[in-house]
From Swiss-Prot:
Pathway field: Aminoacyl-tRNA biosynthesis; selenocysteinyl-tRNA(Sec) biosynthesis; selenocysteinyl-tRNA(Sec) from L-seryl-tRNA(Sec) (bacterial route): step 1/1
Entry protein name: L-seryl-tRNA(Sec) selenium transferase
Cofactors that this protein relies on: pyridoxal 5'-phosphate
Example GO molecular function: identical protein binding
GO CC entries: cytoplasm
PANTHER family on file: L-SERYL-TRNA(SEC) SELENIUM TRANSFERASE
SUPFAM superfamilies the UniProt entry points to: PLP-dependent transferases
NCBIfam families membership: selA
Superkingdom in the source lineage: Bacteria
Catalysis: reaction(s): L-seryl-tRNA(Sec) + selenophosphate + H(+) = L-selenocysteinyl-tRNA(Sec) + phosphate
N6-(pyridoxal phosphate)lysine PTM positions: 285
Amino acid sequence: MKSLLRQIPQISKVVEIFKKKYPEIYVVKAAREVAEKYRKEIIEGKRKDLNGFLEDVERKIKSLMKPNIKRVINATGVVINTNLGRAPLSKDVINFISEIANGYSNLEYNLEEGKRGSRIAHIEKYLNELTGAESSFVVNNNAGAVFLVLNTLAEGKEVIISRGELVEIGGSFRIPDIMKKSGAILREVGTTNKTKVSDYEGAINQNTALLMKVHKSNFYMEGFVEEVKLEDLVKLGHKYGIPTYYDAGSGLLINLKEFGISVDEPNFRDCISLGIDLVSGSGDKLLGGPQAGIIVGKKNLIEKIKKNPIARALRIDKLTLSGLEMTLKLYFEKRYEDIPVIRMLTQDEKALRQKAKRLEKLLKDIPGLKISVIKDKAKPGGGSLPELELPTYCVAIRHDRLSSQELSRRLRLAEPPIVCRIREDQLLFDMRTVFHEDLKTIKKTLQELLSI
């Protein structure tokens, strides 16, 4: 054993072998990790020789050199998959981001006047037009938007909100926690399942700064329930001269019912038309753009928010801003089909079945696979439209040698990774979230994995 341990190549010698081919920092790290692995296996009696040492080092080098964030093929059927990066961006958006990233830009420069300008001005006209708001502002995400609104308008003062709307918005971030950090004082009213206008009104006092509602975007309640309507909250706010604020969550810019999706999901324009003073939402959920926190509403309130020093800490960067501008431009031009999230949500069953049949045909010649096309249900995801199930078609496969769990694992570790779902020991590729251009990649990946 000692003799074999002494034969493990020195790190410096391994570096000499690979230094012309790979950056030294990766070679050193890979050589050390592989040497340690071999040393441990020899001591434990699991290894009797050093065969394959250099090959293992080179494989490790290549693995270390790959970026950690990878493009993933989403075959889960969850359209706004938070773990997989939420909304995929339009090709127009991607090209525009690339163009802006590839040099300098007029991010904060007024070309007409030749002096400093505002970065938000680039998208404000789109947001105001699309939502009907007097003014608008954008920060890095919607949790930041909620924090900024509360800190600006209610620091040291009370914010009245329904107990049933004190939601957790994911990643253990909870509305009460954000409110506490903002300096606002939580005044919860009503019960978990029932809150009335009288509950809000009964809690109003001289220290009340804001009447707030939060859209329950990631769950829904039914049965013996009641919540305060936005229009009633507006009337109450007007009666006492207190601003109203609605966290709409998903950032919807259109009426989904016009696209055949029968859900009562609030969109920015409808909320503003009801008279809510401020509305906020996410950029990378139902809106289908990059991550951002969008705030629209009354100009006097937005101006206060813009002047808050914390706004700079939550500032949106130029690439996100570029992506958001182009996404909003697509909405402005009514090019909804070019927005991937909207396109995926509104795909008809016939198109999904055709896509499934095409993948089935591509996979039929791969040995050992049992393939079928099945009808199933997909989900919007991203903490949006929790009650909605979308009809979809899946290609279901089962291998005669590998379990579905093992095949799923191998697909996740492939290049590019492919993430599916498993049901009844079948691997399902949901066509609602698989792009046409990914079908041949799925075939090629399965061929390579199953030929090993």
